[in-house]
Amino acid sequence: MTHDHAHSRGVPAMIKEIFAPHSHDAADSVDDTLESTAAGIRTVKISLLVLGLTALIQIVIVVMSGSVALAADTIHNFADALTAVPLWIAFALGAKPATRRYTYGFGRVEDLAGSFVVAMITMSAIIAGYEAIARLIHPQQIEHVGWVALAGLVGFIGNEWVALYRIRVGHRIGSAALIADGLHARTDGFTSLAVLCSAGGVALGFPLADPIVGLLITAAILAVLRTAARDVFRRLLDGVDPAMVDAAEQALAARPGVQAVRSVRMRWIGHRLHADAELDVDPALDLAQAHRIAHDAEHELTHTVPKLTTALIHAYPAEHGSSIPDRGRTVE
C-alpha cells in the first residue's frame, strides 16, 4: 500500500522527525514473517557491533586522557548498549511456533521488550536531569576538555547511526520495539552531544554551559520518551493505524458476494498483524459458496494490508436492510 501524500520538508519537519519519527504503523515492504524476524535479529547484531566499536574507541580516548569522569560515562554508554539484548531474545522467541498454551505464538514478548526499552529511556531522562541540576547547584570543572569533546563526538556519531538504522528497519518490518530501541540509542547520542557541547562551552569560557546543556538534553530525551512510550503502549493495548482498518473495510466491501462489512478488528502481535472480520453475504448461498466468499476475502485482505499475516473471516447471512454499523470515526 502506497501513500500519496508528500512528506513535509524543512528544518521544523526534520526536528520533528528526530523526536517523533514518521510512521504509518505498518511496514513498507518486508512481508515474510521469517524474513522480517531475521532482519530484526540482524539489525540488533549489527547495531551492537557498531556500539561496541564506538565504546572501544572511547576506551582508547579514556586511556590516553586519564579522565576518570570520562571512563564512567563510557561505561554508562556501554551498559545502555546492552539493553538491545532483551530485544534480540524477544525476536528469537517470537520465531518459535505457537503451542497449545500460547496459541497466538510468542510475538507479544517483543512488545514486552519494548516496554523494557521505554523504562530504560525513562531512567536515562531521570539520570540526565538529576546530573544537570546537581551540576547547576554544585558546578564542576571539566578537565581534559579536548579529549572529552572528542569522546562526545565519537559517541554521538555511533549512537545516531545506530538510531537511524534501528528506526528504519523497525518501520520496514513493523516492529515498535525496535523503533523504541532506536530512539533509546538516540537518547544516548543526545547524552554524548551534551558532553561535546559542554566541552565547547567551557573552552569558550562559559562554565555554566555544562548544566544548561544537560537540562536541554533532558527535555529532548523526554520528547523522545513520549514517542517511544506512545508507540509501544499502543501495541500493548492492541492499537492500530485507523487507515489500515479503513483500507481493510474498503477491500472487503468491494469483494463479489459481500453485501456489507459488519466489523473489522486488528491487532499487532509483535511485528505481525492479525485481523478478524465479519461479513454479510446473500442468505440464499449455500455453505460452500459462503465459505468461498470468506476465503477469497481473506486472500484479498492479506494482499491489501501490509504486514497482515493472518485473517479470520466470518460470513453471516445478510438480514434485510443490513449495512456497515456506525462505530464512529473518532480516533486517537
UniProtKB/Swiss-Prot annotation:
The record's GO CC annotations read: plasma membrane
Q: Where are the transmembrane segments?
A: 46-66, 75-95, 113-133, 145-165, 202-222
* InterPro entries per UniProt: Cation_efflux (IPR002524), Cation_efflux_CTD (IPR027470), Cation_efflux_CTD_sf (IPR036837), Cation_efflux_TMD_sf (IPR027469), CDF_Transporter (IPR050291)
Give the subcellular location.
Cell membrane
Mitochondrion keyword on record: no
Quick one: where is this thing mainly located? membrane
Q: Name one GO molecular function term.
A: cadmium ion transmembrane transporter activity
Gene Ontology biological process: intracellular zinc ion homeostasis
> What protein am I looking at?
Probable cation efflux system protein Rv2025c
Organism, by scientific name, is Mycobacterium tuberculosis (strain ATCC 25618 / H37Rv)
